[in-house]
Every structure is written in C-alpha cells, then in structure tokens.
Design a protein with these regions (language model features):
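N-terminal amphipathic alpha-helix/helix-capping segment at the start of soluble metabolic enzymes
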Residues: 1-19, 84-89
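Hydrophobic faces of well-ordered beta-strands that scaffold small-molecule active sites
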Residues: 18-22, 47-49, 95-99, 124-126, ...
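Glycine-rich phosphate-binding active-site loops on the catalytic face of alpha/beta enzymes
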Residues: 44-55, 121-125, 130-133, 175-181, ...
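Active-site beta->alpha loop and helix N-cap motifs at the rims of alpha/beta catalytic domains
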Residues: 51-53, 62-127, 259
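Glycine/Thr-rich beta-alpha phosphate-binding loop at enzyme active sites
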Residues: 65, 73, 161-199, 236-238
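Alpha/beta catalytic cores of nucleotide-metabolism and tRNA/nucleoside-modifying enzymes
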Residues: 80, 195-203, 212-218, 222-261
Length: 261
C-alpha cells in the first residue's frame, strides 16, 4: 500500500514521483543509512535498495564497481535486512529491493519474503527474471504482502501489453535496451511505448535506466508517473564515500526541484 500511496500523493498534487537507487553496504551500512535518509529528506518518494551481486548483468560499470566494493566490505543480505529494520524507525518511505533471482533462491524464497515482510520491504525488482518465470516467486511474494515489480522494455506491442496487464506496485519502464548507466540522449519512441502501457494498466509507471540529472528527469517525467535515478547517485557515493550524504542530498534535491518546476 505504501507504494500506491506514494504515487497517489504526488499525483493529487500534480507532481511526479521520484525513485532513487543505492547499492547497499557501499562504504558500510551506516553510510548507506545516512544516504537513504538524505534522499528521503530531499524529496525521494521510493527508495530502491540494491543488493550487491558478484555478476550484475543488467548493470553498467558504475553499479558493478559499487557492488564489488560493497561485497569486499562484507555486506550480506542478512546485514541489509537488519539495516532496513533500523531505518524503519526513521521513515515510512516505501523500500523496494532490487536483486537477482539467485540471491533469493540461495537465501530461501520463503525465508526471504518472510524477512521482507518483517523488516518493511514493500516490493522487489528482479531484473533478469523473465516475465514468464515470474510465477516462481509470485505466490510467496503475494502471501507476504510484497509487490513483485516487473520491468518492461520497448519491445513488441504484444509483450508490452502482457507485462502491463500483469503489473503490480509500479511498472519499471526501461528507457532503452542495454545496461544501466547515464546517457546523453534516448532513441526510444516514448509516446508509442507509454501509449501501449497506459492502455493496458492503471498501475503507475516509472521510467529508469540512464537518467543522469535534473533536466533529463524533468524531460522524461512527462511520459509517466515517476522517474528512477540510480547510477548518477551511485557515482556520487563512489566519489565521496563516507562524506557522500550531503552531496547525495543536494543532488536528490536538484532532481526533486526540477520535477516540481
């Protein structure tokens, strides 16, 4: 419900939702907590909590390096759940975990979603799980009140339609086919892409993969209900380390201000 409420609150005010991403444990759990609260305080509506993975195939070099750095620092899924539980004493902002299927399977599907429910995780995004295999975790996720959020790429009309009709939480609309990372320009026909989506679902849609700064976020927001910014934030954290929370706040505030112009 928190995800739905976050989008509805912005929509009621004629605004767009801002979703920001962070690699958990990069420079330690305390730095991650501070950065998450910086994003929340600067106006982020939903936080994507990235679970570091040794071979993140959907990610560009910035997130790959941050994942590696986090794992080398001793980050574990159990440690991330503990961190999330602590954060729940500070904020009700929706949290969405982004990870790969192996992370869930190794941990144990039932145990994983049980902890999601207990610690206050609102949704999961599993980027390399094909839409056709989504049922492998769907029943358990639903039983624990966790949204299984789908990604949709600018593919065939029929495929976009199928994914949109089945969406829950929000629909993660991939701006262009490839890996994450910042881009200078996009080549996708967004009018046609979002036209198919909006005809087939009333679930909010947010666009991500490649949004590098405030003006690009503003430009992309006209097509959908929210924008997702990840690599640009991860890059700031990589650059400033334990001193990053202030910079992350400033960058997120810049995104929020641009969306509200």
């Amino acid at each position: 419900m928190r995800i739905k409420e976050a989008f509805e609150k912005r929509k009621t005010n004629g605004q767009k939702a801002l979703i920001t991403y962070i690699v958990s444990g990069d420079f330690g759990y305390e730095t991650t907590k501070k950065n998450i609260m910086s994003m929340v305080n600067a106006g982020a509506d939903i936080i994507e909590i990235g679970i570091p993975f040794s071979d993140p195939i959907a990610e560009g070099i910035v997130i790959q390096e941050a994942s590696q750095h986090s794992l080398e620092g001793g980050t574990t899924l159990a440690g991330i759940f503990k961190m999330v539980k602590e954060l729940r004493n500070e904020t009700d902002t929706p949290f969405v975990m982004m990870m790969y299927p192996n992370t869930i399977y190794r941990f144990g599907t039932e145990r994983f979603f049980d902890l999601c429910n207990e610690c206050g995780i609102d949704g999961v995004i599993v980027p390399d799980m094909p839409f056709e295999e989504k049922d492998e975790i769907q029943e358990t996720a639903t039983a624990h009140g966790v949204d299984n959020i789908s990604l949709v790429t600018p593919a065939s009309h029929d495929r976009i339609e199928s994914i949109a009709k089945d969406a829950e939480g929000f629909l993660y609309c991939v701006s262009s086919i490839g890996v994450t990372g910042t881009r200078n320009e996009f080549t996708t026909d967004f009018d046609a892409f979002f036209d198919v989506i909006k005809k087939n679902t009333e679930i909010p849609c947010a666009v991500g993969f490649g949004i590098s700064g405030p003006q690009q976020a503003k430009k992309m927001s006209r097509y959908c209900d929210g924008v997702i910014v990840g690599s640009a934030i991860v890059k700031i954290i990589s650059e400033y380390g334990e001193d990053s929370p202030k910079k992350v706040y400033e960058f997120t505030k810049g995104l929020r201000d641009a969306l509200d112009e």
